[in-house]
Amino acid sequence: MEPAIKYRLIKKEKHTGARLGEIVTPHGTFKTPMFMPVGTQASVKTMAPEDLKEMGAGIILSNTYHLWLRPGEDIVEKAGGLHKFMNWDRGVLTDSGGFQVFSLAKLRDISEEGVAFKSHLNGEKLFLSPEKAIHVENALGADIMMSFDECPPFFESYDYVKKSVERTSRWAERGLIAHQNPATQGLFGIVQGAGFEDLRRQSARDLVGMDFPGYSIGGLSVGESKGEMNRVLDFTTPMLPEDKPRYLMGVGSPDALIDGVIRGVDMFDCVLPTRIARNGTTMTSQGRLVVKNAKYSEDFRPLDPKCDCYVCKNYTRAYIRHLIKADETFGIHLTSYHNLYFLINLMHQVQDAIEQDNLLEFREAFFEEYGYNENNGRNF
């Protein structure tokens, strides 16, 4: 049986671990490395599907936990799956719900069977197991699905993380058995292990032995420093097969994207660009710009003079500041669109740099202009 997800390696960058590739899904092909906008509840906040296509998004992420609780996977399935439900004909990836259960849910109780917890919406008692998570993801119909895993805190004890990794491997195997649609939905395994190299190796070895069509790196961007994250990536990505995609979960700051690519990561997602946009904060080639600040009230330049998105072509900082201060939703739409475009376009620039074997030079120039080399509060 042909796998639902195929990865083709196009080129390796000469001086780093970066890879140029493409991923084929049942709903189209996209080039990697790439950034995925997050549509938590089957919608990227304030964005129409047409906006996402216009900015070049090839795949978006939705959250299994939220859609399971509301509207329910049965309703999405009756609609014909997420693609039809939200009128999106490109790729969709769903997480397993595990991260939300471990971070949002109250009074969770972890056992070998799964996790008992209370809904963050109404306090209802619920239970999520590897089989249930896969059942929900099968019903949602995403092109790429995630295994149900435990995401332990980064600074948890070695003994706890070891037990957690072993349980995550057992859960991954149970999820594979429960998976009903391997020909149309690709299920990824998630490598855990916090900051411990031997536990990351154990996790990777277990999962690679199960022959998933792709692998996620979980348990990062959860409070550790960027240096710690890069240290873990340095030893984790080489443990993963070269002929499968590698996905770093929950990472979306420009520096972390570039540094992740340098270490061999192909896919990223994060709520960061839309979350900060709702607070009037934007990413520009010159670093962070908080457009809601008073100093922009008479600034009639675009958010980023170097950006060619439709927001920067048509609207000024002063106008966008006015909208944000007046609580107009259109202002949040404009900042969200720009931030998503900025990251998707950044990944296109990174792809070009890999093609030209000058990714390290690109990183140096980008970091200098963005302000990452100074402690000036402009960066993320």
Curated annotation (Swiss-Prot):
UniProt keyword annotation of RNA-binding present: no
PANTHER family linked to this entry: QUEUINE TRNA-RIBOSYLTRANSFERASE
Ranges where the record places region RNA binding: 250-256, 274-278
Entry cofactors: Zn(2+)
GO biological process, one term: queuosine biosynthetic process
Cellular component GO terms held in the UniProt record: cytosol
Classification lineage: Bacteria, Bacillati, Bacillota, Bacilli, Lactobacillales
Organism: Latilactobacillus sakei subsp. sakei (strain 23K) (Lactobacillus sakei subsp. sakei)
Family in the record: Belongs to the queuine tRNA-ribosyltransferase family.
Superkingdom of the organism of origin: Bacteria
Record gene name: tgt
Residues annotated as the enzyme's active site: D95, D269
Function: Catalyzes the base-exchange of a guanine (G) residue with the queuine precursor 7-aminomethyl-7-deazaguanine (PreQ1) at position 34 (anticodon wobble position) in tRNAs with GU(N) anticodons (tRNA-Asp, -Asn, -His and -Tyr). Catalysis occurs through a double-displacement mechanism. The nucleophile active site attacks the C1' of nucleotide 34 to detach the guanine base from the RNA, forming a covalent enzyme-RNA intermediate. The proton acceptor active site deprotonates the incoming PreQ1, allowing a nucleophilic attack on the C1' of the ribose to form the product.
Catalytic reactions of this protein: 7-aminomethyl-7-carbaguanine + guanosine(34) in tRNA = 7-aminomethyl-7-carbaguanosine(34) in tRNA + guanine
Protein name: Queuine tRNA-ribosyltransferase
Cofactor-binding details, from the entry: Binds 1 zinc ion per subunit.
Gene3D superfamilies recorded: Queuine tRNA-ribosyltransferase-like
Any GO molecular function: metal ion binding
InterPro entries noted in UniProt: ArchSynthase1/Queuine_TRR (IPR050076), TGT (IPR004803), TGT-like_sf (IPR036511), tRNA_ribo_trans-like (IPR002616)
Protein EC: 2.4.2.29
